Structures are given as C-alpha cells and as structure tokens.
Amino acid sequence: AANRKLKPMAEYEQLDENFDKAELTSKLSNLYVQMQDCWQKKDISPIRPYCTDAFFTQMDNQLQRKKQQGQTNYIERIAVLSVELRGWCQEGGNDVLVARLNTRIVDYTLDDKTGKLISGSRDKEKFMVYEWDLVRTTGTKTEKDKPMQTVNCPNCGAPVEINASAKCPY
C-alpha cells in the first residue's frame, strides 16, 4: 500500500450505503484471532474463504513443514489492540481497502514428542503490526444484516472478547 494513493474511507461509505467501519474492524479483529487459532490447530481450512490463493498456499506449505517436523506453533494471549482502516483505492476492477492491525501475542514452537521449546518464548509478548489488503469486485455492496462468525472459547463456548487477553474468563 506504500505506493498507492489511498482515498478516505468516508468516500467509500458514500459508494456503499450499508458499509459500516465499526462492523468491519470488529470482523477483522475476529478474523485475526481465528487465523491464529487455526494456525495452532494446524488446520487453516476454516479461514480459506478470506485468503487469496497465494496467501493460503503459503500458509498451508508452512503448516505442512511444521507437521512433517513434528512441531506445533502455539499462539497465546492473543489481543488485537487496534484496527485502523487506512483508506481505499481501485485496482484492476477491484476495490482494495487497506487495514492496519496492531496486535499482541505470545508465540512459541514446541516439539510434539518431547515438549521441548524449539523457538519463541512462553512468556514474552510480541507486538506485531499487519497491513491487510481487503479486496472485492468494484460495485459489490455490503449485505445488510449478514451474520458475523465470532470466536468462542473451545472449552465452555463463551464468546471470547477480542480486544482483551483472549483467555476465557469463565
């Protein structure tokens, strides 16, 4: 996005009357947590609809290597600290919205057989910044009242508050 001339999001909202910045930022927070959860489970198929072919293939190849090496990447204390919609542009018949996510995780890899720490830290927090390009065909309108998939605690089913520690309070 560095070389793109981005238009303000207010202009995009005028093109799509159902577009809601707050709803999109919430969806992006949820998607980030889902992506980390899928990565740790070594099954990224649930997030396939949200990825380009190239990005999905890259992640899948990395996961296959982890499986072959007998390693699991653990991602804990996930928090999306902020989501900023930076702007939008049109490229090749698509609307491209640019979002920046500021996140925090604890990230480490263990050997599946021995439990030995391979890389990372079980305690040290990593602060990460991601820039995501969200792409859809120019002219596509936001569907009103489309339900959003949320993240729930795998143990008790309670909804996980994305902007908190992503640890179940129940």
For the regions a language model picked out, list residue spans one by one:
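Core segments of small alpha/beta cavity-forming domains
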Residues: A2-E76, S165, P169-Y170
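Short flexible coil/turn linkers enriched for glycine and charged/polar residues
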Residues: K41, Q90-D95, E125-M128, P147-M148, ...
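Surface-exposed, charged secondary-structure patches
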Residues: Q69-K113
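Hydrophobic/aromatic beta-strand elements that line small-molecule binding cavities or substrate pockets
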Residues: V83-L85, Y130-L134
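Mixed-charge, low-complexity intrinsically disordered segments
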Residues: D112-R122
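Cys/His-rich Zn2+-binding cysteine-cluster or related metal-binding knuckle/ribbon modules and their
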Residues: T142-V151
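Short cysteine-rich clusters marking metal-coordination/redox-active sites
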Residues: C153-C156, C168
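Cys/His-rich microdomains that often coordinate metals
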Residues: G157-A164
